[in-house]
């Protein structure tokens, strides 16, 4: 029996054991990871079948690993990623549902086997609806309300749901450093530039206090991939539950500005300055305890870090992985970064880019 046939047999056995042996199966393909999805049909009902084969990705970050141990384990441990673990998805989904939010309900799961049957939230992705002409204002308002609900909730250090347990680790100094250093590792291979020891020393000196502030304020559940291709519009539901949330298994404890940046610095679609301002105003109006100037400084600093991280990832996808389509998204990210650089608190970072990253390479 081949590996693929063994996997198919395991999937069929799982479905049968959990009351889904009689469904019609429709392949939906995969996502950017090793996961694959099917839609299961039974009469008028449909469900989503998630298949995350074990051992295809390296291990997630152990909660107590030292920096040296994380470096030895590799990128997932350095960045504090879940390595596609189904138990992470199940535990995060359960926590989000407990807050009254619309993560897919887990109907059956075998985390060790990497299999789960989920509630089907439909196909109305924010990105798809907006591209088709749907008014984006209520969608983004609801997305902000979703973040407000998440940020208002007490966040445990360990998530537990239906037998699955998952540590909610902090987006700490090392994970943040790993994020911004992707840029200086991969941008030179994408554009003909180089960073000498002096440039890299300046880079680290600029980022160290930003990372320290980011870790100190890491107090909320952070979806980590909260953008228009991972949000589903559910207008028949109420309030923040109108936002269906996907792809949250890499959640961490982080600064509340991180997911705002993911939403408003969307790499795949342009979020206008007017929409960004309206969303930030909505968020801050609901949180009068925050100092607006201080919060926006954090938003611009961590937003810049996030944008720079994505620039590095896309450079890696183009140069190492042979995926040239990601180059199409890069100019948009530079526009977002220029907006962040307008914050006087980022004058040093802007000056670094002006010295070492020529404008003609920012494309």
Curated annotation (Swiss-Prot):
<dbReference type="InterPro" id="IPR011009">
    <property type="entry name" value="Kinase-like_dom_sf"/>
</dbReference>
<dbReference type="GO" id="GO:0009252">
    <property type="term" value="P:peptidoglycan biosynthetic process"/>
</dbReference>
<keyword id="KW-0808">Transferase</keyword>
<keyword id="KW-0573">Peptidoglycan synthesis</keyword>
<comment type="similarity">
    <text>Belongs to the kinase AmgK family.</text>
</comment>
<dbReference type="GO" id="GO:0071555">
    <property type="term" value="P:cell wall organization"/>
</dbReference>
<keyword id="KW-0133">Cell shape</keyword>
<keyword id="KW-0067">ATP-binding</keyword>
<dbReference type="GO" id="GO:0016301">
    <property type="term" value="F:kinase activity"/>
</dbReference>
<keyword id="KW-0418">Kinase</keyword>
<dbReference type="InterPro" id="IPR002575">
    <property type="entry name" value="Aminoglycoside_PTrfase"/>
</dbReference>
<comment type="pathway">
    <text>Cell wall biogenesis; peptidoglycan recycling.</text>
</comment>
<protein>
    <recommendedName>
        <fullName>N-acetylmuramate/N-acetylglucosamine kinase</fullName>
        <ecNumber>2.7.1.221</ecNumber>
    </recommendedName>
</protein>
<dbReference type="GO" id="GO:0009254">
    <property type="term" value="P:peptidoglycan turnover"/>
</dbReference>
<dbReference type="GO" id="GO:0005524">
    <property type="term" value="F:ATP binding"/>
</dbReference>
<dbReference type="Pfam" id="PF01636">
    <property type="entry name" value="APH"/>
</dbReference>
<keyword id="KW-0547">Nucleotide-binding</keyword>
<dbReference type="GO" id="GO:0008360">
    <property type="term" value="P:regulation of cell shape"/>
</dbReference>
<keyword id="KW-0961">Cell wall biogenesis/degradation</keyword>
<keyword id="KW-0119">Carbohydrate metabolism</keyword>
<comment type="function">
    <text>Sugar kinase that catalyzes the ATP-dependent phosphorylation of N-acetylmuramate (MurNAc) and N-acetylglucosamine (GlcNAc) at its C1 hydroxyl group, leading to MurNAc alpha-1P and GlcNAc alpha-1P, respectively. Is likely involved in peptidoglycan recycling as part of a cell wall recycling pathway that bypasses de novo biosynthesis of the peptidoglycan precursor UDP-MurNAc. Is able to complement the fosfomycin sensitivity phenotype of a P.putida mutant lacking amgK.</text>
</comment>
């Amino acid at each position: 029996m081949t590996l693929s046939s063994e996997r198919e047999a395991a999937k069929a056995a799982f479905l049968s054991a959990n009351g889904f042996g009689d469904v019609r199966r429709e392949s939906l393909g995969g996502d950017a990871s090793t996961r694959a999805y099917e839609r299961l049909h039974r009469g008028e009902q449909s469900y989503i079948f998630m298949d995350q084969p074990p051992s295809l990705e390296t291990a997630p970050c152990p909660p107590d690993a030292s920096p040296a141990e994380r470096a030895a384990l590799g990128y997932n441990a350095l960045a504090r990623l879940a390595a596609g673990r189904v138990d992470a998805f199940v535990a995060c989904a359960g926590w989000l549902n407990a807050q009254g939010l619309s993560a897919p309900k887990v109907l059956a799961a075998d985390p060790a086997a990497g299999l789960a049957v989920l509630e089907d939230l439909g196909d109305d992705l924010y990105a798809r609806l907006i591209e088709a002409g749907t008014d984006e204002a209520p969608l983004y308002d609801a997305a902000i309300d979703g973040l407000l609900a998440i940020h208002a909730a007490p966040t445990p250090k360990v998530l537990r749901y239906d037998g699955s347990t998952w540590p909610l680790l902090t987006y700490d100094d090392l994970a943040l450093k790993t994020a911004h250093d992707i840029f200086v590792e991969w941008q030179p291979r994408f554009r003909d530039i180089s960073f000498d020891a002096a440039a890299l020393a300046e880079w680290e000196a600029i980022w160290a206090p930003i990372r320290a502030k980011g870790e100190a304020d890491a107090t909320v559940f952070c979806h980590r991939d909260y953008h228009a291709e991972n949000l589903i519009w559910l207008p028949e539901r109420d309030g923040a539950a109108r936002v269906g949330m996907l792809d949250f298994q890499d959640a961490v404890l982080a600064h509340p500005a991180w997911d705002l940046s993911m939403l408003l610095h969307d790499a795949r679609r342009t979020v206008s300055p007017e929409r960004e301002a309206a969303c930030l105003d909505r968020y801050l109006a609901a949180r009068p305890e925050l100092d607006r100037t201080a919060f926006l400084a954090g938003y611009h600093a961590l937003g810049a870090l996030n944008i720079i991280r994505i620039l590095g990832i896309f450079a890696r996808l183009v140069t190492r992985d042979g995926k040239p389509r990601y180059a199409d998204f890069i100019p948009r990210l530079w526009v977002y970064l220029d907006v962040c650089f307008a914050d006087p608190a980022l004058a040093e970072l802007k000056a670094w880019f002006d010295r070492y990253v020529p404008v003609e390479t920012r494309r």
